């Protein structure tokens, strides 16, 4: 017995030698610790975050000897670790153009939850994005309980998000704090941001800062792209799945000199194979090609910084009835879906720091977008163009040298241009032509107060004027109170507004033959108040920490557009809420812990109660899950060579639009269903390979295309999707990155 014990002890010694740890402290230029700074071995998914004292410990790996240290609002730095026994002291300087500094912290590496900000915020890091195939933004929330992503119809492959039980139209989508996915882009824009391009994602619940506008009613999602100063000179990410979809991403960043750096990103996606798993004659997913290009520049000169980003995209989708159906029905007219999209967007940021001691700075952000979509859905043609121009000029300063009282104020201007043309026999007039030019100048001010780590307060107000809707005011209030280090309490309340775009907001109706009834020539501005409360407990369990959190958010609409699919099973009636009611209540509880070194687990459960007045009655909103359960677990071996990730989802049932009582073609409700995803990753020195599977339960919605045998008939409807359209899917991928030499 003793002999075997000694053999075990001595065989473990080499493992102990290789599992050396690097420790250090991350602080700002004033010496204050940065809580929640992300520490990552460059070119890998191996990382950690600093604790409440700015301290971190991370095990070494053969894959890299360069630590990438980043923190929201500060310049990312890279430190070469030659001697792991030396303690690192890293000092990060603030980025002058980044006026919204956000501090986040947690012990979980993948998803980092805020501890000391007033707004409830989660940061999905690069490590979390590597836990799944994550081909694009829409697939980045599989391990997140707060955000749902699902197909909006069974024919076009369009995906939309939901937060707090409501459509993603009420979530403000940002790209590096500039306008992102909105308007025409909301239907397919989630797929236009490749996972390999993203550095991190910040998810805020409830009404967020007024600095970025008035549109965040239920939350805000901000995407940070890879930065040219820190990303690898050349990195490749290739993926291939069992449905013969192939995707290649290439990224790179180069420092031209000490002041100027540039980065480039490329994506190509090809999906050329037809799939019809339920044999209804319709493709489960459209075929298509996508090319996506991005170029960005970063310039800094002492107190001045400038960023320029330009992106171009072309996406072509071809769906409808399969080739096999066409060959068997040569005498019939096939139902075709063809959607071609061209998009160009970008931004220019300028920032200048006048006084480093008080953080006095000015920032000017300009962005623009051009989006063109030409669509064919059977006998319906929908062609639309959107243009957007945005300008935000901000001034920021601290009232004191202790950085407790901060004021941010500024002016903004937003211009939206829409030109829509709809030709269909589903409109009473047969034709819909509308051009909209909306100008919205605004002014805002925001006060941010922090008292040690116990109290954070964010109070803001903005006033905007629209040439369509006149003057409107947006007050918002967020507070965090933490009397002890193990407990956080937050509360928020604020207003949110948006200008409705009835057709683009409900594009899934194009994949049906329901008659479209527009009760208004111009629909009222949507207005809502959102209030929420959340609490988090940090419970020490030996050397580990259990995080328990719970939150409840309530959204009440004063005005919104109602899509009535109940009054007539062959129509969709759009109307203002008027004197009706519409609200959404959302409760969520979550627990996360590192069970053993390298083994983490998260459990979450969410309940949603979403109702609105439909046809004169207050009813549950259709196609909305009543609950969601989530279990995620991740294990990384001691030498950081292997990583195993498993995610299980339990999606609650809900209500479907009322079927035709004389000829019911669908049920009045849908039941809950499970989904299971898993991935295994192996890390080499500068490369990694991953294999995984999605929807391993092979659950599929039965007959997602209603009336598929007669797609030009009145019963055809592919818009009532509540579950997966395709079954189990496997994939394999490869990541490679060249080490930076600077």
Task: Pin down the residues of each PLM region.
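C-terminal beta-signal and adjacent terminal beta-strands/loops
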Residues: 4, 597, 650-657, 681-742
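Flexible loop and strand-edge segments within Gram-negative outer membrane beta-barrel domains
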Residues: 271-292, 300-362, 368-388
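Membrane-embedded beta-barrel scaffold of Gram-negative outer-membrane proteins
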Residues: 363-367, 371-375, 482, 488-490, ...
């Amino acid at each position: 017995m003793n002999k075997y014990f000694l053999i075990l002890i001595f065989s473990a010694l080499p493992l102990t030698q290789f599992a050396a740890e690097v420790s250090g402290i991350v602080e700002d230029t004033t010496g204050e610790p940065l809580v929640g700074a992300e520490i990552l071995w460059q070119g890998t998914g191996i990382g950690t975050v600093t604790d409440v004292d700015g301290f971190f410990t991370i095990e070494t790996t053969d894959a890299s000897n360069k630590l990438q240290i980043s923190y929201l609002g500060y310049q990312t730095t890279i430190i070469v670790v030659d001697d792991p026994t030396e303690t690192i002291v890293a000092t990060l300087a603030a980025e002058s153009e980044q006026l919204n500094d956000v501090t986040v912290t947690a012990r979980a590496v993948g998803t980092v939850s805020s501890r000391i900000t007033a707004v409830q915020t989660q940061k999905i890091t690069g490590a979390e994005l590597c836990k799944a195939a994550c081909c694009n933004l829409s697939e980045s929330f599989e391990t997140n309980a707060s955000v749902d992503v699902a197909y909006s119809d069974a024919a076009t492959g369009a995906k939309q998000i939901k937060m707090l039980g409501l459509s993603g139209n009420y979530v403000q989508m940002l790209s590096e704090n500039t306008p992102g996915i909105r308007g025409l882009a909301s239907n397919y824009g989630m797929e236009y941001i490749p996972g390999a391009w993203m550095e991190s994602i910040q998810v805020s619940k409830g009404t967020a800062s007024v600095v970025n506008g008035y549109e965040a009613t239920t939350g805000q999602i901000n995407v940070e792209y890879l930065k040219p100063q820190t990303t690898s000179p050349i990195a490749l990410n290739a993926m291939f799945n069992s449905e013969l979809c192939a995707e290649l991403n290439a990224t790179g960043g180069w420092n031209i000199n000490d002041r100027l750096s540039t980065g480039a990103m490329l994506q190509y996606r090809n999906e050329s194979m037809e799939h019809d798993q339920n044999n209804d004659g319709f493709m489960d997913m459209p075929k298509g090609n996508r090319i996506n290009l991005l170029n960005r520049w970063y310039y800094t000169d002492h107190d001045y910084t400038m960023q320029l980003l330009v992106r171009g995209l072309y996406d072509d989708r071809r769906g409808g009835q399969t080739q096999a159906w066409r060959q068997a029905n040569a005498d019939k007219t096939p139902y075709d879906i063809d959607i071609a999209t061209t998009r160009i967007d970008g931004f220019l940021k300028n920032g200048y720091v006048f006084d480093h001691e008080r953080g006095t700075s000015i920032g000017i952000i300009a962005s623009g977008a051009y989006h063109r979509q030409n669509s064919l859905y059977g006998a319906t043609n929908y062609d639309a163009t959107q243009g957007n121009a945005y300008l935000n000029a901000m001034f920021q300063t601290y009232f004191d040298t202790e950085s407790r009282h901060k004021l941010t104020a500024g002016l903004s201007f937003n211009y939206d241009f829409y030109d829509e043309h709809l030709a269909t026999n589903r409109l009473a007039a047969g034709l819909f032509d509308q051009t909209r030019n909306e100008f919205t100048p605004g002014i805002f001010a925001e006060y941010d107060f922090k008292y040690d780590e116990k109290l954070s307060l964010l109070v803001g107000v903005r006033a905007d004027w629209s040439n369509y809707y006149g003057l409107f005011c947006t007050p918002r209030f967020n507070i965090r109170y933490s009397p002890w280090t193990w407990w956080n309490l937050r509360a928020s309340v604020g207003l949110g507004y948006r200008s409705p775009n009835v057709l683009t907001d409900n594009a899934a109706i194009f994949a049906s033959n329901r008659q479209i009834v527009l009760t208004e020539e111009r629909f009222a501005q949507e207005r809502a108040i959102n209030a929420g409360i959340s609490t988090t407990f940090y419970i020490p369990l030996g050397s580990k920490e259990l995080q328990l959190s719970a939150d409840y958010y309530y959204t009440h609409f004063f005005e919104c557009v109602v899509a009535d699919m109940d009054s007539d099973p062959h129509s969709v009636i759009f109307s203002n809420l008027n004197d009706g009611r519409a609200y959404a209540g959302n409760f969520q509880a979550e627990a996360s812990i590192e069970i053993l070194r390298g083994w983490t687990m998260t459990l979450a459960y969410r309940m949603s109660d979403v109702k609105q007045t439909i046809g004169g009655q207050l009813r549950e909103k259709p196609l909305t899950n009543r609950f969601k359960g989530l279990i995620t677990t991740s294990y990384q071996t001691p030498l950081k060579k292997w990583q195993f990730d498993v995610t299980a989802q339990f999606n609650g049932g809900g209500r479907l639009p009322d079927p035709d009582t004389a000829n019911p073609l669908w049920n009045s409700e849908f039941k809950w269903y499970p989904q299971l995803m898993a991935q295994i990753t192996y890390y080499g020195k500068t490369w990694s390979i991953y294999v995984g599977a999605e929807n391993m339960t092979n659950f599929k919605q039965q007959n997602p295309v209603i009336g598929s045998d007669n797609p030009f008939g009145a019963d055809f409807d592919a818009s009532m999707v509540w579950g997966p359209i395709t079954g189990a899917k496997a994939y394999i991928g490869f990541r490679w990155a060249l080490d930076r030499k600077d």
